[in-house]
């Protein structure tokens, strides 16, 4: 009984630690007090001011564009890489697997400096393309690991049976592997989107003044105090992220049920 109460209290403390700051942020986005120290009444004026803050909206647009592109490319390349690591034997396979974990475990500052040196050596101007390549680089291993873990749970006999029945490798990939891996693919995309949206360290090294993204914009703003418009924008992004997670899970579930029934 005591152990159950301790476990319940421990879990409650963890959830409170995780979600109370988010709740405070959402509440303050509707608080008429500019400093958010005490509640002074409900208002939506911070959302109205946000709509007129061109620099903040432009940074948000840049971040959303970067997150969508980097998540899409990282998911595409990472999913195919995971399939290759799962299905085929080739020279250098252990090296490729090891390098993926090296990228995942490397400190952000190390990756940031490495990418900056690479761009300088190649003569690439810092801006959209350097930032996109960098975000794809650090998102890619997470997609590979997520999709590969899903593939490892497959029944290999199903793939062998499809091959014995004359299915080509492309048909096996399209009809069996991808539909069954779709939940992991969707999870990899959402994870990549989130990693791209909140990255500060790598982005601060590899972006240029012509392409300012939201995390760097907010970081520069909070040095002189958190603006209520930032609370409003964070609330909108939080709702957007929640909608994407729910939608990706529903889409992945529907595709898994529908496509696996069509395998012949």
Curated annotation (Swiss-Prot):
Main subcellular location of this protein, as a coarse class: membrane
InterPro entries, per database record: Bact_Polyamine_Transport (IPR051789), MetI-like (IPR000515), MetI-like_sf (IPR035906)
Segments passing through the bilayer: 8-27, 66-85, 101-120, 129-148, 177-196, 232-251
GO molecular-function terms, A-Z: ABC-type polyamine transporter activity
Stretches of the chain found on the membrane's Periplasmic side: 28-65, 121-128, 197-231
GO biological process terms on file: putrescine transport; spermidine transmembrane transport
Domain of life where this protein originates: Bacteria
Entry keyword annotation includes Transmembrane helix: yes
Keyword Transport in record: yes
Cytoplasmic side: 1-7, 86-100, 149-176, 252-264
Signal peptide: none
This protein's UniProt keywords: Cell inner membrane, Cell membrane, Membrane, Transmembrane, Transmembrane helix, Transport
Stretches assigned to the ABC transmembrane type-1 domain: 60-248
GO cellular component: ATP-binding cassette (ABC) transporter complex; membrane; plasma membrane
Subcellular location: Cell inner membrane
Membrane topology: Multi-pass membrane protein
Functional note: Required for the activity of the bacterial periplasmic transport system of putrescine and spermidine.
Annotated family: Belongs to the binding-protein-dependent transport system permease family. CysTW subfamily.
NCBIfam families on file: PRK09500.1 (NF007047)
Name recorded for this polypeptide: Spermidine/putrescine transport system permease protein PotC
Organism expressing this protein natively: Escherichia coli (strain K12)
UniProt gene name: potC
């Amino acid at each position: 009984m005591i152990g159950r109460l301790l476990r319940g209290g421990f879990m409650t403390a963890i959830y409170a630690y995780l979600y109370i700051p988010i709740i405070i942020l959402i509440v303050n986005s509707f608080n008429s007090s500019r400093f958010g120290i005490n509640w002074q009444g409900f208002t939506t004026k911070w959302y109205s001011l946000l709509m007129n803050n061109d620099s903040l909206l432009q940074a948000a647009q840049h971040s959303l564009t970067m997150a969508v592109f980097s998540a899409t490319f990282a998911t595409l390349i990472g999913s195919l890489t995971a399939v290759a690591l799962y299905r085929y034997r080739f020279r250098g396979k252990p090296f490729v697997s090891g390098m993926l974990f090296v990228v995942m475990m490397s400190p952000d500052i190390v990756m940031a400096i490495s990418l900056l040196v690479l761009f300088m050596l190649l003569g690439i101007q810092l801006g959209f393309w350097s930032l996109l390549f960098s975000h794809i680089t650090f998102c890619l291993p997470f997609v590979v690991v997520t999709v590969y873990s899903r593939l490892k749970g497959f029944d290999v006999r199903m793939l062998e049976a499809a091959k014995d029945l004359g299915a080509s490798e492309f048909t096996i990939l399209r009809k069996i592997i991808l539909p069954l891996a779709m939940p992991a693919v969707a999870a990899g995309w959402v994870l990549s989107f989130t990693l791209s949206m909140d990255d500060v360290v790598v982005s601060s090294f590899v972006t240029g003044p012509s392409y300012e993204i939201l995390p760097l914009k907010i970081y520069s703003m909070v040095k002189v105090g958190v603006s209520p418009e930032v609370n409003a924008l964070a609330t909108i992004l939080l709702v957007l992220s929640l909608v994407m997670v729910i939608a990706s899970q529903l889409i992945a579930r529907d595709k898994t049920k529908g496509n696996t029934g069509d395998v012949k």
